Amino acid sequence: MQEDKTVKIIDYVILFFSFLFLGSFTNSIFINQVGYYFALLFILIRGVYTRKNPFIKTGLEIPFLLFIIVEIISTILSYKTDQAATNMLKRVLLLPIVYFVTASAWDLKRVKFFFNTYITFAFISAVIYIVNSYDYFIKGLFQITGSGPGIFQYPITTSILASFTIIFLFAFLIHEKRDWKYKLLVFVAFSIALLSIIATYKRTGWLGMAAGMSFIILMKRKWFYILPLVIIIVASFFAEKNYSNVRFFSFDGNKIELQTILNTEGRASSVTKIDDEVYISDYEGGLAELNNNKQLNYIEDTPMPILDFQRVNDSLYSAWLVDTRFRIYKKDNEKFIFSHEFASPGLTEDYRLFNQNIYTIDKDSGLTVMNAKNGQRLYRNPLDDIYYKVDVNDSLLVLRSRDSRIVVYSMSKGIPVNKLYDQKFAKKIHIDWLDGTTVYMQGEAKFHKIENGKASILSDNKIDPILHISKRKGSFYAVDLANEFVRLNFDKGSLTIDRLGTFKSLPYDFQLFDDMLITTTYKQGRIASIFDPYLPSNFVRVSLWKAGWQMFLDHPLFGVGDIDLAELYIKYKSPYDKEIQGHLHNNYIHILAILGITGFIAIMWILGKIFYLNLKVYNKFKDKEFIGSLALGAAGCFVSFLVSGLTEWNFGDHEIITMIWFITGLNITLYLRKKEAG
């Protein structure tokens, strides 16, 4: 009796930590791992106490063992043994999740409890994510940020986890033969989860979701679901309204009115006024000049898409390209002739051209000042933080970090010399700009200014976050996130705001003249961007894959070790591949690079075995309620994982691989417990 009581207490403890594990998949990796390791610990304690092996064979033992052996050999051969050993340990310690599930879900009732707990909290996480994405939907922030908010984890991880939730719900929706009330409930949950993955704005999760759902349709042979799926994809593609144009507004000093819209060949990025000439940086369309008839003459086809065009001096001009290089041109008889090009040492987030010098702020290498006339580096400061905005004039240089740290330097002969101000604001700073010796800032609640190294509050903030701002005739003109064009007047410490008009589409850039406003606007749909060779995230992936393949060719048997690949990538990449990442955004190439062909074979054996087991379980119970739906959803989730792994290193993502081992263990447990129950 005493033994039974002790075992019951241990079982309740296991159940408690299992609950933490199951309820935190989509919202807290810390709680999730606490739940897993403590549940596993008490399962082992239970086994020692009862003198019974709590674990059962799953059929994955031999491929798991081969994987561990390859990891050990690869670690020994790696030039970063310590790091490889750490990563190996992380991966190996997650493998027992499969066995933890089989040991703790000891009957069908417990299997259902495990799944229902997971899916309930996954749904709650989806609702929370949608609520926090409200501004992204309403104000169109997706087009600016390129992703949804990071609430519980990185948006790309959120999208993959959400795809699993959607696939499970889809499986229950089309497999269960229940009444309409049940179907409606599942459909509502499915729709809400679908909205949450849309809110991530991440194509990897979308791709995996589509693959998993398509696999389920294939397994069920319910071809009539294919048509609506195709219709939705095609309709989404055409409904995304891809466009690029230059818009002309009349301006009488008090309001703007749209006059003309001129479509462009590329993506109208920036508009630049140089003397009486106006230039449009049209991304892949190249550089265009606006003639007197408001028509575009394309005058330069740049080797990579152009983001911005500025004048260096009377004879030199600078084009900033998407790969962050600066391309310098001479102007001769109205024609631009290429002179030279150069780049900052890192991944440029922002730059300013001032007094023939280019000031760049790099994500990974700080501040660099270069002479635009010859590309010579005049100044380098690696800095002590990661900044992404820079502004400069004769007197001051200002840096801003994403967490609203503002640093101000004094200038001497074009070089920053003394730090005058350094402060991290408690509330977000949306934008800062220089005017003489004053730094103006718009925060969430207040407008601030910095003068003589001291910050003060100017006024309350009564407009949405400002995206672009420019000074003309003593006033500041700006575009905010509410699509409004406003004038800001600072007079003796007070601020007045004049609202001059509203844009239908958020401008990317603008130039104001005496009686005219010119804006550039473009929008590219997220689905269409999958096939865009000039999208930075796309060509960065291609560069990573090429480098990863070369790493494999140089280390074919056991790879370079299970390490962060950033340092190696620098050696393999081309000079203008500036974005440095520690993984290769592809499971299969990454595995080849870090573990060689032996590791690739071991992991493909594991994945192939799991795929076979998923099919076996589904085919065994496809006529059963709940069990068949769960097995079908598990198989669909695994297919989703395999497909999304084509563009993401999700095998190495702690949250994702934890989920995969859990689903695998749950499906195996389902098979074993149902078999035991007859």
Briefly describe each language-model feature range.
Residues 1-83, 105-112, 116, 172-184, ...:
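Transmembrane signal-anchor hairpin modules in multi-pass inner-membrane enzymes, especially those
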Residues 147, 241-275, 494-505, 509-546, ...:
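Flexible juxtamembrane loops connecting transmembrane helices in multi-pass membrane enzymes
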Residues 21-29, 592-595, 629-668:
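Membrane helix-loop boundary segments at the extracytoplasmic
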Residues 21, 112-141, 153-254, 274, ...:
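Alpha-helical transmembrane segments of multi-pass inner-membrane proteins
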Residues 595-639:
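Hydrophobic transmembrane alpha-helices and their immediate junctions
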Residues 531-546, 550, 554, 558-595:
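Long extracytoplasmic/lumenal interhelical loops at the membrane interface
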Residues 60-67, 81-104, 113, 126, ...:
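Aromatic-anchored transmembrane helix interface
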Residues 266-273, 304-312, 345-355, 385-394, ...:
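Repeated scaffold domains used in trafficking and secretory/extracellular systems
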